[in-house]
Regions:
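Alpha-helical membrane segments of multi-pass proteins
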Residues: 1-283
Length: 283
């Protein structure tokens, strides 16, 4: 009984915020409420809802909460490889799951009109950030930028810069994965696959560089002290592998999903009756 109580206390402590950020907590809670409100309005049998999509969307939000509002955030600030795993979640895994849910219809249905109308003013900015030439450059560029040793050093020592870094990664991840996984979006299947493949080589190069670098590139973790007694170079090598392999696999999985969407659309098109010409109607 005592062991169970101690385990429960340990889990509760770990799940409690390390440094509570009202903005992250409010964002996760608001997104969940708006989505579920919209899903309820549309109905469970609506094609935009179903049962798997809410699970994917809420799982993405849960991952965001875990890496930003639990004691995992402590590890992310005092070890390099947990930090890279945190950004893998914020920039890849969580936005991927949320975009996979195709939540546009549910979010639109759940958003109060007084908020929905002003939010349309952001459309030109979103269109710019999701431009086919801008989106992959921004997606890869942010990863490189925040891993410039001098920039990374300052970001890990400044609470404001640290939050800016995490928010920029998450927002850009949502914009990118929403663009490439939405079948009825602004891009066709081929262009979405090209974008997914375009971001792979730069991530491989960066991950390989971090993994095989003979020197420690990020000494901020020595200044602050590491959470675990792990050799600095080993910490960096594991972080490099996280930047390299899982991030690349996300693009591969995304490509397979788009190919599946393409096959489904072609099957649906073949099942449609041929369109009748005016001559057919007259005859």
């Amino acid at each position: 009984m005592a062991e169970s109580t101690a385990l429960l206390h340990s889990m509760t402590t770990w799940l409690a915020p390390w440094e509570f950020s009202p903005l992250w907590g409010l964002a996760c809670l608001t997104a969940a409420i708006v989505y579920m409100r919209g899903a309820r309005r549309l109905g469970r049998h609506h094609p935009a809802v179903g049962w798997s999509r809410p699970i994917a969307f809420l799982a993405g939000l849960a991952l965001v909460y875990i890496v930003t509002q639990t004691h995992y955030d402590y590890l992310s600030q005092y070890m390099f490889f947990p930090h890279r795993a945190q950004h893998l979640v914020l920039h890849h895994a969580a936005p991927f799951l949320m975009a996979l849910a195709l939540p546009g219809a549910a979010l639109a249905a759940g958003l109060p009109m007084r908020i929905a109308r002003p939010s349309r003013r952001l459309r030109p900015l979103v269109d710019l950030l999701q431009h086919p030439l801008v989106a992959p450059l921004l997606f890869v560029g942010l990863i490189y930028f925040w891993l410039i040793p001098e920039v990374h050093f300052n970001a890990m020592l400044s609470q404001d810069l640290y939050q800016l870094m995490n928010w920029s990664m998450f927002i850009d991840g949502v914009l990118f994965w929403w663009l490439v996984l939405t079948p009825s979006g602004r891009l066709g299947h081929g262009r979405r696959i090209l974008l997914l493949l375009a971001v792979v080589p730069p991530q491989i190069l960066l991950g390989a560089y971090l993994t095989f670098s003979p020197t420690v590139l990020f000494d901020v973790y020595e200044v602050c002290g590491r959470a675990w007694p792990l050799a600095p170079l080993v910490d960096q090598q594991i972080g490099g592998l996280i930047t390299w392999i899982p991030a690349t696999m996300m693009s591969v999985i995304g490509t397979l999903i788009v190919l599946r969407q393409l096959r489904r659309d072609e099957t649906r098109r073949q099942r449609m009756p041929p369109s009748r010409t005016p001559r057919d109607v007259i005859g």
